[in-house]
Regions:
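PLP-dependent enzyme catalytic core of the Aspartate aminotransferase-like
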Residues: 118-119, 127-128, 141, 145, ...
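Conserved PLP-enzyme active-site core in the AAT-like
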Residues: 7-16, 78-298
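Conserved small-domain helix->loop->beta segment predominantly found in fold-type I
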Residues: 259, 271, 280-282, 287-358, ...
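Short loop segments at secondary-structure junctions
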Residues: 33, 223-226, 333-337
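Conserved N-terminal alpha-helix of the aminotransferase class I/II PLP-enzyme fold
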Residues: 33, 38-90, 112-120
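Short Gly/aromatic-enriched secondary-structure transition segments
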Residues: 43-49, 346, 404-407
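Short hydrophobic/aromatic beta-strand micro-patches
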Residues: 221, 330-332, 391-393
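N-terminal glycine-rich, Lys/His-bearing helix-loop that initiates the first secondary-structure elements
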Residues: 1-52
Length: 409
């Protein structure tokens, strides 16, 4: 999708009901409940015979508009907006998994996703099968009749590995298993996940979509392409909806877990959508230019960015995400002490977590996100104490490079 297509689709989505004052900005409905003209209309709404809003934990006009805008630019069947990226992951897998089922995934996962899988889902009787997602034969051998999903982070954080989505999709679909992907690192304005075989897309909208680090949010995007008749848990809903997954999620799981996005966040992130493409274009190009400069900077041991020609994942990253695959890179210094010394000398780049804010952010993953993990767990997850993760913002390449350079002296 090019910029013109993205913006035209996004800005072409009208609010479902005309505002009484003709506001060009999105109305923010902070109302918890909604009045009906009759008992009959209320019954129809609560029983799902109409699409009227009843209670903002279930649906809300402002949040629904945000969901519709995401649908318009992704060609999705259904979109559910939640209050964080982890809410998206947990809601999705509580919809998919059952006691006795298993999930096939990479060992190299974002810290909270790993914790949710290993500590939370396993307590409900769900098995997590870790494997190398870049080894298709190994992936295939892990999938069986009780596999509820093959899960992949399109670029792992902070390990920066890239799996072949088309190959994973082919193996998963041959065995009647959905491919579920966390695509947070590369936004949907830059690539089409459904074209690469992704069935369910999970996104932390806190990141690129929020833009300015103003709000927490998460998205579950169902492309409506998977045949759920082979799902042990969801096949009973196939006669009720084109997507049994979306039906189960909206009618039960998200209502019961109570993690729906708030109207204020939907308003802010809907505005963020309007500048997503132009912000990402600048940030990702800056990230590539900076990565090239860091390769030749004294004191930097190694640089990991998929867009570098000597990166082992360069070709697959280029084919899936283009020349600038995301606005995050990692680089290694000689020791943890050198990392801390460097962090403490930075003047422009902010020492903070989060990704894809308008300002550049840096963090030492091993001591923060993975700080409570054992050394053995960090080694298994591929997290090194010499690694720094940099999220590139809207600053100039020169300003970022000069800040890094002076901090290394």
């Amino acid at each position: 999708m090019n910029l013109k297509d993205f913006e035209d689709r996004l800005l072409g989505v009208s609010f479902p009901k005309k505002d009484v004052y003709g506001s060009l900005s999105i109305p923010v409905y902070h109302s918890l409940a909604f009045e009906f003209d009759s008992a009959e209309e209320m019954e129809d709404a609560f029983c799902g015979r109409t699409n009227e809003h009843t209670y903002s934990r279930v649906t809300n006009p402002t949040v629904h508009y945000f969901e519709e805008r995401v649908k318009a630019v992704t060609n999705a069947f259904g979109v559910t907006a939640l209050n964080s990226g982890m809410a998206a992951i947990s809601n999705a897998f509580f919809t998919l998994a059952w006691s006795g089922s298993n999930i096939v995934a990479s060992r190299h996962l974002f810290g909270n996703t790993y914790s949710f899988f290993v500590n939370t889902l396993t307590s409900f009787g769900v098995e997590i099968r870790f494997c190398d997602l870049t080894n298709i034969d190994e992936v295939s051998s892990m999938i069986d009749d009780n596999t509820c999903a093959l899960f992949v982070e399109v670029i792992t954080n902070p390990q920066m590995e890239v799996a072949n989505l088309k190959d994973l999709s082919r193996v998963a679909h041959q065995k009647n298993v959905p491919l579920v992907a966390d695509t947070t690192i590369v936004p949907f304005s830059a690539f089409n996940a459904a074209d690469l075989g992704v069935d369910i897309d999970l996104i932390s909208s806190t990141k690129y979509i929020s833009g300015g680090g103003t709000s927490l949010g998460g998205l579950i995007i169902d492309y409506g392409n998977f045949n759920w008749e082979h799902s042990f848990k969801l096949k009973q809903y196939t006669s009720l909806s084109k997507s049994a997954f979306h039906y189960k999620l909206r009618k039960e799981i998200h209502r019961n877990l109570g993690a729906y996005m708030t109207p204020e966040v939907a308003y802010m992130q809907s505005l963020g959508l309007e500048t997503l493409h132009v912000r990402y274009e600048k940030e990702s190009k800056t990230c590539l230019e900076l990565a090239k400069l860091l390769q030749n900077l004294k004191g930097v041991v190694s640089v990991n960015y998929t867009g570098l020609a000597d990166n082992p994942f360069y070709e697959i990253g280029l084919s899936q995400f283009g020349e600038c695959p995301g606005a995050m890179l990692t680089f290694d210094l000689g020791s943890k002490d050198l990392c801390y010394r460097f962090l403490n000398r930075l003047e422009l780049i902010k020492r903070a977590t989060n990704l894809f804010d308008n300002v550049s952010l840096i963090i030492h993953p091993a001591s923060t996100i993975y700080g409570t993990y054992t050394p053995e767990q960090r080694e298994m997850l591929g997290v090194k104490e010499t690694t720094l993760r940099l999220s590139v913002g809207l600053e100039s390449v020169d300003a970022l490079y000069n800040d890094i350079k002076q901090a290394l002296l």
